[in-house]
């Protein structure tokens, strides 16, 4: 009987989208957004390595480096708008759960959510 040959596989799960009509009191608060991205990593079962944040005009850009890849949030309080990207190379992670946690915390009244399978077999 022949054994099954498994090919090397790279896992890639990406969830990204736009958040509209968000709570403006949160969108400009760097420290609050840092806490949100930290908790989002936990919600998505990701291993947080570092968080960097920059105040840009009234908005904030947050980049969380997780062992499995990254989480980003970019905000525009003047438009009640944010974009979010959660990408993971870990089969044990749930980027969708992390994304939806951010949607909830930014109190988005509506949002788009896109999911991409960026996995590859070699």
UniProtKB/Swiss-Prot annotation:
The entry's comment on post-translational modification says: Is synthesized initially as an inactive proenzyme. Formation of the active enzyme involves a self-maturation process in which the active site pyruvoyl group is generated from an internal serine residue via an autocatalytic post-translational modification. Two non-identical subunits are generated from the proenzyme in this reaction, and the pyruvate is formed at the N-terminus of the alpha chain, which is derived from the carboxyl end of the proenzyme.
Q: What terms describe the molecular function in GO for this protein? A: adenosylmethionine decarboxylase activity
Write out the transmembrane intervals.
none
Tell me the domain of life.
Archaea
- Reactions catalysed, as given in the entry: S-adenosyl-L-methionine + H(+) = S-adenosyl 3-(methylsulfanyl)propylamine + CO2
Q: Site Cleavage (non-hydrolytic): which residues?
A: 68-69
Q: Which residues carry this modification: Pyruvic acid (Ser)?
A: 69
Q: Does the keyword Lyase apply?
A: yes
Q: Name one Pfam family in it.
A: AdoMet_dc
The pathway this protein participates in, as annotated, is: Amine and polyamine biosynthesis; S-adenosylmethioninamine biosynthesis; S-adenosylmethioninamine from S-adenosyl-L-methionine: step 1/1
Swiss-Prot/TrEMBL keywords? Autocatalytic cleavage, Decarboxylase, Lyase, Polyamine biosynthesis, Pyruvate, S-adenosyl-L-methionine, Schiff base, Spermidine biosynthesis, Zymogen
How the cofactor binds, per note? Binds 1 pyruvoyl group covalently per subunit.
Q: Give the enzyme class.
A: lyase
> What are the GO BP annotations of this UniProt entry?
spermidine biosynthetic process
Record-linked InterPro entries: AdoMetDC_fam_prok, S-AdoMet_deCO2ase_core, S-AdoMet_deCOase_pro-enz
Q: Which GO terms describe its cellular component?
A: cytosol
Q: Which residues form the active site?
A: 69, 74, 89
**What's this protein's name?**
S-adenosylmethionine decarboxylase proenzyme
């Amino acid at each position: 009987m022949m054994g099954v040959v498994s090919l090397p596989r790279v896992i890639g799960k990406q969830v990204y989208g736009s958040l509209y009509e968000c709570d403006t009191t949160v969108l400009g608060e760097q420290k609050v957004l840092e806490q949100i991205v930290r908790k989002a990593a936990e919600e998505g079962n990701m291993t947080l390595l570092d968080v960097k944040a920059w105040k840009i005009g009234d908005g904030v850009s947050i980049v969380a480096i997780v062992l499995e890849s990254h989480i980003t949030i970019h905000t525009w309080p003047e438009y009640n708008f944010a974009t979010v990207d959660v990408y993971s190379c870990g089969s044990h992670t749930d980027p969708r759960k992390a994304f939806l946690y951010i949607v909830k915390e930014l109190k988005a009244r509506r949002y788009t959510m896109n999911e991409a399978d960026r996995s590859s077999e070699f």
